[in-house]
């Protein structure tokens, strides 16, 4: 389980998995604040990485990073997100023992966002740099979720794995349990984001396959 910017369901999931004889994997789908890139509003670019604990020390490090995000870098007002700063990840590199696995974030990760913007060379550079920094603990996410962007993303993601000898991992983000729950999820999201459900110009972040 990898909750968005938190470990909210970790303990309940851990207990349920252990009772069923399944090894639980705990992590965070983290929002990372870039130290060098900006978005269309000239604010620090925010991208996703999935951080998974390899062991108890890794779990403790996730707690530390997540707490730091909420204490030191939480947004104000309607923007109450708690983003990890990119430079904090250097602590994972400098550690004597690697305790965390890092997944690239898929289409919403740094690599995915750069591909979407057409900054292909920068995307490949980012993949190479992250591979060099995190070694065998870094994986490129491969995902097919029905988005208009998935074909282009998959082509480059597979090519990166081959070019830089990076490890691929198949993922599927799920935001609701059953396919028929899509409309309820969209409604809930629009309430939280103060958007109008039937606004044709509203950004479509989810689709019916994300279950």
Model regions and ranges:
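Phosphodiester-processing cores and adjacent nucleic acid-binding clamps
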Residues: 1-211
């Amino acid at each position: 389980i990898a909750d968005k910017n938190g470990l909210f369901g970790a303990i309940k999931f851990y207990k349920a998995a252990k009772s069923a004889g399944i090894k639980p994997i705990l992590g965070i789908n983290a929002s990372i604040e870039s130290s060098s890139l900006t978005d269309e509003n000239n604010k620090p670019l925010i991208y996703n990485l999935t951080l998974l604990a390899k062991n108890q020390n890794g779990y403790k490090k996730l707690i530390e990073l997540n707490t730091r995000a909420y204490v030191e870098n939480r947004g104000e007002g309607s923007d109450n997100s708690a983003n990890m700063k990119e430079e904090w990840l250097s602590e994972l590199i400098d550690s004597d023992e690697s305790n965390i696995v890092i997944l690239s974030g898929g289409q919403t990760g740094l690599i995915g966002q750069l591909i979407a913007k057409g900054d292909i060379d920068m995307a490949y550079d980012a993949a190479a740099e992250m591979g060099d920094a995190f070694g065998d603990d870094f994986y490129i996410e491969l995902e097919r979720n029905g988005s208009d962007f998935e074909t282009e993303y998959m082509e480059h993601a597979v090519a990166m794995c081959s070019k830089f000898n990076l490890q691929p991992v198949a993922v599927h983000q799920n935001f609701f349990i059953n396919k028929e729950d899509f409309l309820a999820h969209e409604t809930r999201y629009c309430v939280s984001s103060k958007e109008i459900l039937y606004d044709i110009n509203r950004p479509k972040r989810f689709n019916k396959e994300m279950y």
